[in-house]
Amino acid sequence: MSSVDYQSLYNTYWQRPDRFGSSSFADATAMARRVMKVAGAGSVLDVGCGFGALVHALLREGIDARGVDIAPVAIDHANATSPGRFQVGSILALPFPDGAFDTVVCTDCLEHLAESDVQVALRELARVARKNVFIVVSTVQDRDHQWHLTVRDRDWWELQAFTAGEGTDHLLRRHPRSLLDVSYEAREHEGPSVTLTLEKCPIAMREWPRERLLKDRGLHMDMLREPGRRADAHLARYVHAASVVRPGDSVLDASCGLGYGSHVLRQCTSGASVLGVDIDPQAVAYAQAAYGESARFEVADATDLSRVADHSIDLVACFETLEHVSEPEKMLREFVRVLTPGGRLLVSVPHDWTDESGHDPNPHHLQVYDWARLRAQLLVAGGADAAKPAPSLDNTLWIEQLHRQLAGGGMKHASAARVIAPLAVNVQDELVEPDLAKSQPTEWLLATAIKSPLAPNSACSPATYRETIFTDASGSVPAGNLASFKRDYENPWLLRSMIALGMRITRPTLLRELARRVMQYAPANSPDFGGALCVLLYDALTTPQAAAFESELLGRVSTLDTQMSRNPHVLRWRVSNWFAAGLLHQRRGDLAAARAAFDRCTAYDVLAFSPLLATKTIEARFRLGCMIAGEDLAGAKRHWHAGVLEAQRVLQADWVNLWGDDQAPLPFALPEASQVIDLAARCAAALRAGEAWRSSPAHALAMT
């Protein structure tokens, strides 16, 4: 029983003129969307709802939301707007059964409780929640210096949340998507309040209290049940890895420990599956109990993944492991073996944690890393000469990115802020050399490497392609041309590593070199060649190259046009390359050549590939019209009218080549179809501008 009469206190509080009708956040809709970003849809209870601003915002978003508050005056006012959605109740004894709501929200309420009541309230929030608890709590005193009875920092509040339910079936842990709400770096600057985004633990966790976990904390810890910035750092690495997981990916969490990272990878991505392996049977038992609904866990040595087939894993995450093993090179070679062509490997290691004696004081660390050593091991794992490892497209593993990470609170850089940032590159876009790395404070190194999609001296791959991204409702390749990469490409793995935006290699020089290698070895009448050429054309648009090289690329567009082929994807690249050539000619100042390229782009029937390809032909029509409107308005109108009619024509065609499967439309299909309409709308606006192209060309252009 609390010693504070909260009902009398807050009935009076809400009747004050400066408090009546107020809310603790300026934008209730923004807060509602934050809740939805973490919790998704489902029923929501707002505890300490006040006048109901958040509940009303959630209702407007289509969420089944209700509110409860200790103060009748606030509840009466809220029910006047949404009758029956609010009721009087105490956070210390909520009037709802266990698991009554998918998500329980509590904003700016807990700090108003006496410290002795905090854990009781947290247990109640967890009890009535089925899945999620979303808390915002102030960490500073209120303006009147009387209402905030518990003023503590984030770490204290997190620990209370993690321990409040011990001995019950209502334990809480961090939500795996918590860093998607308040990012790792943003936690340094949260201001006067902090957000705790929590998830209900499985009932089996009752057998695993934190005290039991703390006994092995030096080697294993569930960072979703650990407060503080060091735990934030561990979770941030997995969120970083999640950002490059492609839809449909098979993910391996190597040396997964207690499995929290596997859970983050599964809940923060559209990957198809996550497999966590660890050599410790006890760790795997915990992982299965805690996170078995998200991922599959097996006891296995990451240096011997013989049960994992070659070319079967799309992403391997291996964090804080290489320094623990006697043969890190052997482990890295296993990762390369199991990765698919174009698959990614993400590893992290402590960056030179040696003390004054030159030794790492952590007894479990067998290796000491700096960038030079990590780089060399990655290159050797990819086949480079161990005596003189050097980056090369002939290697099987290419280094794509390098990040540094700081957390603060450790042996070194104790006062550092939370940071994950790319390490500097030089003007040639080469990754930093060791002397430069030393000038940037670093606690951990995070490297991203990509497995080559090419066999040696070839544009092909040794692995059989499997489609996991662009599938229909049954998981098969949909009918039509759009996703027929295995049918049409010499090496369909290039789609992921070279072609698809948001999936392909992110380092410009590496992408450029891959495209050049493909053009060197692929047949000129293949979509592989055409796609590589398109990559280089757009690269030249954003990063101008030597004039002779640009001229060579433009000449290749014409050469490709003479190659005989009925391959639909070859047509796709011919249209795209003529359009890109027009843009490049414009940038180079050769407007006559640009008009000729755009004209050639519009000469193809895009329906032999897909209605979506009309984004190129219609924009080409629009650009052609704009280029000649001042001197030949009638000719410009013909181009714009042709653009409008092209949209009408292609959208009347069979939509199998527009979206694949209407039960599971391809993810890019309807957004690109909307671009067809948008571009046609620009042509229509240009037509309607009429004589304004002569009398007020700036106004005419603004209309489009």
Segments (PLM) and residue ranges:
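Structural motif corresponding to the intra-repeat A-B loop/turn of tetratricopeptide repeats
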Residues: I505, T543, R588, G630-E631
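Conserved N-terminal segment of class I S-adenosyl-L-methionine
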Residues: M1-P97, T103-V105, S116-L122, D144, ...
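A short beta-strand submotif of the Rossmann-like class I SAM-dependent methyltransferase core
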Residues: C106-C109, L315-T321
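Short, glycine-/aromatic-enriched active-site segment of Class I SAM-dependent methyltransferases
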Residues: V133-D155, V347-Q367
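TPR/TPR-like (Sel1-like) alpha-helical repeat modules
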Residues: D599-A603, K637-L651
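A short glycine-rich, Lys/Arg-flanked "PGG" loop and its adjoining helix->strand segment in the class I
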Residues: Q119-V133, E329-P341
